[in-house]
From Swiss-Prot:
One Gene Ontology term from the biological process aspect of the record: aerobic respiration
Record gene name: nuoI
Provenance organism: Burkholderia multivorans (strain ATCC 17616 / 249)
Keyword Transmembrane helix attributed: no
Cofactor note: Binds 2 [4Fe-4S] clusters per subunit.
A cellular component annotation (GO) from this entry: plasma membrane
PROSITE patterns in the record: 4FE4S_FER_1 (PS00198), 4FE4S_FER_2 (PS51379)
Designated name of the protein: NADH-quinone oxidoreductase subunit I
Length: 162
């Protein structure tokens, strides 16, 4: 670039005007910003959100303490303790998920042989302290009880792909 060309580019501010023209072109286009939480975007049917533990229709919890979900979790976010009952079946005494470690990969849900642990469509949850994101067995069962109809519908819709 010659000195004269450089002088004209800097004197007439052509680079600045090109930038302003580009900005002007995008000023009046449709905006893609979503004003969350007032506006919501559609959620995929396979979205993986908050975990829940399910129960059978008779009220008994589904988890058989096989510990497959604990073994397959890449983030080591699941902790399970179990005991043998009088009828020689295992049941969990402790089932904890640390959501600060969880990467929501869905391996726990895929590995469960009795569909006990599921990931729901719930994405609006928070914790003000680190301990608020540590879900115990009772908390997970409460989520499962509250949203059982939604969970069952999502499982039925996803059945052809399993």
């Amino acid at each position: 670039m010659t000195a004269i060309q450089h002088f004209f580019k800097t004197f007439f501010l052509t680079e600045l005007l090109k930038g302003l023209a580009l900005t002007g072109r995008y000023t009046f286009r449709r905006k893609f910003t979503v004003q969350f939480p007032e506006e919501k975007t559609p959620i995929s049917p396979r979205f993986r959100g908050l975990h829940a533990l399910r129960r059978y229709e008779n009220g008994e919890e589904r988890c058989i303490a096989c510990k497959l979900c604990e073994a397959v979790c890449p983030a080591l976010a699941i902790t399970i303790e179990s005991e043998t009952r009088a009828d020689n079946t295992r049941r969990t005494t402790r089932y904890d998920i640390d959501l600060t470690k969880c990467i929501f990969c869905g391996f726990c849900e895929e590995s469960c042989p009795v569909d006990s642990i599921v990931e729901t469509q719930i994405l609006e949850y928070h914790g003000e302290k680190r301990g608020d994101l540590y879900f115990t067995k009772e908390m997970l069962l409460a989520v499962g009880d509250r949203y059982e109809k939604d969970i069952a519908a999502a499982k039925a819709a996803d059945a052809p792909y399993r």
